[in-house]
Swiss-Prot record:
Protein name per Swiss-Prot or TrEMBL: Macrophage colony-stimulating factor 1
Related illness: A defect in Csf1 is the cause of the toothless phenotype (tl). Toothless rats display osteoclastopenia, severe osteopetrosis, and dystrophic growth plates.
SUPFAM superfamilies for the chain: 4-helical cytokines (SSF47266)
Glycosylation sites: N106, N153, N171, S302, N353, T355, T357
Amino acid sequence: MTARGAAGRCPSSTWMGSRLLLVCLLVSRSVAEVSEHCSHMIGNGHLQILQQLIDSQMETACLIEYKFVDQEQLDDPVCYLKKAFVLVQVIIEETMRFKDNTPNANATERLQELSMKLNSCFIKDYKEQNEACVQTYKESPLRLLEKIKNFFNETKNFLEKDWNIFSKNCNDSFAKCSSRDVVTKPDCNCLYPKATPSSDLASASPHQPPAPSMAPLADLAWDDSQRTEGSSLLPSDLPLRIEDPGSAKQRPPRSTCQTLESTEQPNHEDPQPHPSAGAPIPGVEDIIESSMGTNWVLEEASGEASEGFLTQERKFSPSNPVGGSIQAETDRPWARSASSPFPKLTEDQQPTNITDTPLTEVNPMRPTGQTLNNTPEKTDGSSTLREDQQEPRSPHFATLNPQRVGNSATPYAKLLPPKSHSWGIVLPLGELEGKKSTRDRRSPAELKGGPASEGAARPVAQSTRDRRSPAELKGGPASEGAARPVARFNSIPLTDTGSSIQDPQTSAFVFWVLGIILVLLAVGGLLFYSWKRRSHRDPRTLDSSVGRPEGSSLAQDEDRQVELPV
C-alpha cells in the first residue's frame, strides 16, 4: 500500500466525531440565540403602543365580554402568565378590532406579530384542562386593555430575569382550579352607551364616570317603531323639547338591554284635584299608546301631518281609582300631538260645549272598570288656537273628544325654557312658528265658507292641513263648537285638489302693480297721441309756405336778384 492510499483512507470515527462537534456547536448557538431573543422580545415600544390604545379609548358604560385567567384561583405568577398568554392571543385577534388603516388598527397588528413571536418562549404543558382557571369577565374596554398591558409588562420582567422560566410545568396548579364560571353573556352588543343607574355605580369601573340617567337620543329607534298615529313632523318642524321638573322622571334609555335597573322614581301626591305636577305611575304610557290608532304609518307615507294638534293637552285627573296624581311626561315626539282623527279648532272657532263628563280610557292590559277623569280648562272668547300663539310643546297630554276640546291658556313664555330637542336641533321660537306647510287640502265648499269663515284673513298654506268635510264648513254660527264628523282618511298622496286663498298682502301687491302698469299705459297713450297730432300739423305749415302768391315781396326780391347784371 502506498503512502498516498494510506493517507486517503481516514478512519470513520474521525468523521463521526467532527460531525457531532458541528451539531453541538449549532445547537448551542441556536439556544443562545433563542435565549437572547426571548429576553429582549418585548420592548418599551410595545408598552407605549398599549398605553396609546388605552388613552384613545372613549369613556363609556358599555361592557364587553371576554375570557381571562382568574388570578384568585391561580396564585403562581408564572403559571398565571403562562395560562393568560393563550387568552391574550385570542383577545387580540378576535376582540380588539378597529377600522382598517387607523393608528389603533396598526397597533393591534404589531401586538399580533409580538404574540406570534412569543410562541417560542412559552412551552404548553396542558391539554386536558384548557378551561381551568378561566373566568368570563364583563368589563369595559379600558379595563381589558389595562389587563393586557399588565400581562406584557410582567412577561417582559420575567423574561429579562430568566428566558426559560415559562418552561415550568403548571399542570398541578391548573388542576387545583375549580370551574366557577357563572357570568352570563350581555344581552346587547353595546351599540351605544347605556345609562348607569345609582344602584350599579359601585360595580362600574373606577376609570369611568357615571353616565347620566337620561339619554335624549337613545330611544329614537324605539320611538320610530312604537309611535302611533300622531304627527309625522320633519326634524325642522318639530317643536322644542320642554321637560317639566315636576312631572319628568329620570330613567335609562329604552333599548333591548334589560341588565340595568331603572332608577327609583319619587312619588308626589297632591290631595288637591288640580293639574299639578305629580309622579307618573306604571301603565300611563300603555294607556296613552292604547288610545292612539295605527294610521300614523299611512299618514306618514302620504306626506300628511297633524301639526294642528301640537297645542292640545292630554290631562289626567288625580282622582282616578288607581291613586296618586297622574301626569304623563312628554319625552317622546309623539307625545307632542294628539291623534289625528279629531278635528282641530281654527281661528274663527272657539271651544264650546265643554262638559265635565269623564273620559273612559280602555287599556287591554288593565280592567275595563278603571277610568281616568278628564279635567278640562274652559277658555274665554279671546283665547283662540292660532298657529302663532299656541304652545309648540306642552308638558301635558290633551284628551281630545269630538264633544269636548281642551285648550291650554298658559302662554309659552311662562313655561320652562327648552332644554333639548329630540332630534338634536334647537330652533328659535320665531323661526319655529314661522314655518308653514305648503300642502293645503281644502274643499271648494270651505273656500266659499259660511258666516263663520267670512271676512277672516287666512294665511297662505296653513300648517294645519285641514281635511274637513264641506258640510262642516258650510254651517253658520250655530254649528260652531258642535260635534263634527271625523274626516275620511286619504292614504294616497295627492296634489292640491282645491284652490288656495291668496294672501291679502300678495293680492294687494298684484293690485298695485296692475294699477301702475295701467297708469303707465295711459300716459304712454297720451304722449303718443300728442306726438301724432304734432306730426300732422307740420306738413300743413310746409304746404302753406310752398303755395304762397306770386306777387309777394319775397318773389319780387328773387326776380330782382336774377335780373342783376353779372
